[in-house]
From Swiss-Prot:
Binding site for sn-glycerol 3-phosphate: T11, R81, E82, Y133, D242
Binding site for glycerol: R81, E82, Y133, D242, Q243
Pfam families given in the database record: FGGY_C, FGGY_N
Activation and inhibition: Inhibited by fructose 1,6-bisphosphate (FBP).
Source organism (scientific name): Rhodopseudomonas palustris (strain HaA2)
Catalytic activity: glycerol + ATP = sn-glycerol 3-phosphate + ADP + H(+)
Superkingdom of origin: Bacteria
Name of the protein described by the UniProt record: Glycerol kinase
Length: 501
């Protein structure tokens, strides 16, 4: 039985996982790489670190499984979205560090674009809003701030890509410059209705079309790896951005199904089907996947700080040594205290979209200690998810206007404390699957589908298995009181920004 190898290139580490044909995991490898913070609100990665860690983990996973290139039917790639690399087309060398999705350096540019009235047009075409989060203004910044970059781009000497595109270029030895529709849909340059790069958007951001990759289906033959990498070529047959890949790995194929992934940030996607639904509550309209030339759309809510709030407890405050300690510590908190953390460390994402505000704690007393801070950090993830859930309920008219169950995955989904509190605040069941490597599984599925290893989507969905269902156990009065307190905390933070303005 052949393997399918999934490359899961994330914000803090690169992983490779070998899946068997029955979707069980044969082997995996992971390698972290450095983060760079050259200025307040700036986040960068070295593109060579991303490539080196990806190649190393692929080789390590193959070695653990005793697999050769001949044993692998296909490679699937999933990646941190929106992160931008620009490189020299001839040498393959990046002209600057990658600008990461969390980076906020283009906030002033985005503010000016909004003031100039461009947002309605951009939202209509892309399903997105004007925000530093997305790739377009990052590319423009590189062209304007790296000496000679704009002239080189206009001469056709530079290539642009999200991380999937960069890895595909390196895997194929510089032979293939392509991406898939899910990654393209996150750039602020792609028209999600026509399925092509948009000339009006390219002109607005002054990005030459010659820089841009070909856009393909999420499940397709993108190219073959260079012979010298693995001892023989391996076909690369699937690509999707990490959140779309997780949606596929969670078998969310029917309209109304929703998943939420908890990694560095939190990202909820609700499948809306073949027709894009325009949000009236500051959610994003995005492409969930594209198969056989047909696009399936989703509503998405993006939260910038989820697991990184726990990292802050560990690395910033030093009150825990391991993330697994957070839930037991939160259990010890004083129930008489109502401490709220609004973790706007890099601004607020959906549904507020304010890149200027910064994090704040509300409700602290003289007795507030580590347990209360741990409690507030974990609850902040649940409150932010509630905000997305409420917005989705308001926007989605199918399935009685409310997704009945939330499927969860990612590192924080392993925290029973957090998942139970999430069910309590949503007043809805929260389902955690047996296979929690859903992002990698989604990438593997796309590749395996193209290679003929995995079945069509609905048959694949039959393989989804429940590990645990968390049911709401909080009284309505307590839920309403806690949500009202969160609402006041967010309102207070946003008011402080207005006061400074």
């Amino acid at each position: 039985m052949p393997f399918v190898m999934a490359i899961d290139q994330g914000t803090t580490s690169s992983r490779a996982i070998l899946f068997r044909g029955d979707i069980s995991i044969a082997a995996s490898a992971q390698q972290e790489f450095p983060q760079h913070f050259p200025a307040s609100g700036w986040v960068e990665h070295e593109p060579e670190d991303i490539w080196a860690s990806t190649l190393a983990t692929c080789r390590a996973a193959m070695e653990k499984a005793g697999a050769t290139a001949a044993d692998i039917a296909a490679i699937g790639i999933t990646n941190q979205r929106e992160t931008v690399v620009v490189w020299d087309a001839a040498s393959g060398k990046a002209i600057h560090r990658a600008i990461v999705w969390q980076d906020r350096r283009t906030a002033e540019v985005c503010t000016r674009m909004k003031a100039d009235g461009y947002e309605p047009m951009i939202t209509d075409k892309t399903g997105l809003i004007i925000d530093p989060y997305f790739s377009g203004t990052k590319v423009a910044w590189l062209l304007d701030n790296v000496p000679g970059a704009r002239a080189r781009a206009e001469r056709g000497e530079l290539k642009f890509g999200t991380i999937d595109c960069w890895l595909l270029w390196r895997l194929t030895g510089g032979r293939v410059h392509a991406t898939d529709a899910t990654n393209a849909s996150r750039t602020l340059l792609f028209n999600i209705h026509t399925g092509d790069w948009d000339d009006e958007l390219l002109q607005l951001l002054r990005v030459p079309r010659s820089m841009l990759p070909e856009v393909k289906d999420s499940s397709a033959h993108f190219g073959d790896s260079a012979y010298e990498l693995f001892g023989a070529p391996i076909a690369i047959r699937g690509i999707a951005g990490d959140q779309q890949a997780a949606t596929i790995g969670q078998a969310c194929f029917s309209p109304g199904m929703i998943k939420s992934t908890y990694g560095t940030g939190c990202f909820a996607l609700l499948i809306t089907g073949a027709t894009p639904v325009k949000s009236h509550n500051k959610l994003l309209t995005t492409i969930a996947y594209q198969l056989g030339g047909k696009r399936t759309y989703a509503l998405e809510g993006s939260i910038f700080v989820a697991g990184s709030a726990v990292q802050w407890l560990r690395d910033g405050l030093g009150i825990i040594k391991h993330a697994s300690e957070t839930g037991p510590l939160a259990d010890k908190s004083d129930s008489m205290q109502s401490v709220y953390l609004v973790p706007a460390f890099v601004g607020l994402g959906a549904p507020y979209w304010n890149p200027r505000v910064r994090g704040a704690l509300f409700g602290m007393t003289r007795n507030t200690g580590p347990a209360e801070l741990a409690h507030a950090a974990l609850e902040s993830v649940c409150y932010q998810t509630y905000d997305l859930w409420a917005a989705m309920r308001a926007d989605w008219s199918g399935a009685d206007a409310a997704p009945p169950v939330l499927r969860v995955d990612g590192g924080m989904a392993a925290s029973d404390w957090t998942m139970q509190r999430l069910a309590d605040l949503l007043d809805a069941p929260v389902d955690r699957p047996v296979i929690q490597e859903t992002t990698a599984l989604g990438a593997a599925y796309l590749a395996g589908l193209s290679a003929g290893v995995f079945p069509e989507p609905q048959k694949f969905a039959d393989n989804w298995r429940l590990d645990h269902r968390f049911r709401p156990a909080m009284s309505q009065a307590t839920r309403e009181r806690k949500l009202a307190g969160w609402g006041r905390a967010v309102k207070g933070l946003l008011a402080s920004d207005e006061g400074e303005g």
